[in-house]
């Protein structure tokens, strides 16, 4: 029996990825739901993270290169007092705050956050898809091997403190491509002297696209015609498609 290839759909689906799914798994579910023959996404979200996944169908996959280069915005929840090997709540605790730690002072946090705005250097986490000798770093990490990683320059456009409780803070971060928010959380915790990791992460913008227009998988699957959720090629912001 011939394998079904799907429809030759062209357009962009703004998907609100749920927690617990890999970006590729979410993409494949969306692709099947709209019955597209060709699909790709424009930047991975970790399984624990939620939010905007830009899914390109058919000819819209031509914007993928520009979207990978685009700035992104996140809402991140920082948990103070513990650092993990992965930089987020899924990892193992590797460092704790000094005995007697009772939370962070808001003034100290605001001061530290201001130091991370601009061009900074980050050491990529071991739990990442960056490769060494053809193998992703996360495979080395899972085997208990830590490798030296050269620092990389990234740009933090802004950091806004959205909420604060002493042991947790929620921040809004706009950043350049290649920025690891897990590493940012870890570095903020170290600068405060108490350690920190990500308790939650939600992506709200990728280039010109916003989470405000995104649809969940459940809502997509409940639509009578899921193809109606796609942004048509003539609805895409000017300049995204390469010149032909």
Swiss-Prot record:
GO MF entries: RNA binding; tRNA pseudouridine(55) synthase activity
Short name of one Pfam family: TruB_C_2
Active site: 46 (nucleophile)
Its EC number(s): 5.4.99.25
PANTHER family registered for this protein in UniProt: PSEUDOURIDYLATE SYNTHASE TRUB1, TRNA-PSEUDOURIDINE SYNTHASE
Entry function: Responsible for synthesis of pseudouridine from uracil-55 in the psi GC loop of transfer RNAs.
This protein's name: tRNA pseudouridine synthase B
Organism this protein belongs to: Bordetella pertussis (strain Tohama I / ATCC BAA-589 / NCTC 13251)
């Amino acid at each position: 029996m011939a394998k079904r290839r799907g429809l030759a759909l062209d357009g962009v689906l703004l998907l609100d990825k749920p927690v617990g799914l890999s970006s590729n798994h979410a993409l494949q579910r969306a692709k099947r739901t709209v019955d597209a023959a060709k699909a790709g996404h424009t930047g991975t979200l970790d399984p624990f993270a939620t939010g905007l996944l830009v899914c390109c169908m058919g000819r819209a996959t031509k914007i993928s290169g520009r979207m990978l280069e685009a700035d992104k915005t996140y809402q991140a929840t920082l948990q103070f007092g513990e650092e993990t090997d992965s930089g987020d709540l899924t990892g193992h605790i590797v460092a704790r705050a000094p005995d007697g730690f009772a939370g962070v002072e808001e003034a100290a946090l605001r001061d530290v956050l201001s130091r991370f705005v601009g061009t900074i250097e980050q050491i990529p986490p071991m739990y990442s898809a960056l490769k060494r000798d053809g193998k992703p770093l996360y495979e080395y990490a899972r085997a208990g091997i830590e490798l030296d990683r050269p620092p990389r320059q990234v740009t933090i456009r802004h950091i806004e403190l959205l909420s604060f409780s002493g042991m947790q803070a929620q921040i809004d971060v706009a950043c350049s491509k290649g920025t690891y928010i897990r590493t940012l959380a870890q570095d903020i915790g170290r600068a405060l002297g108490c350690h920190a990791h990500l308790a939650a992460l939600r992506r709200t913008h990728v280039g010109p696209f916003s989470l405000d227009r995104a649809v969940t998988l459940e809502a997509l699957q409940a639509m009578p015609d899921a193809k109606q959720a796609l942004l048509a090629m003539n609805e895409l912001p000017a300049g995204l498609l390469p010149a032909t």
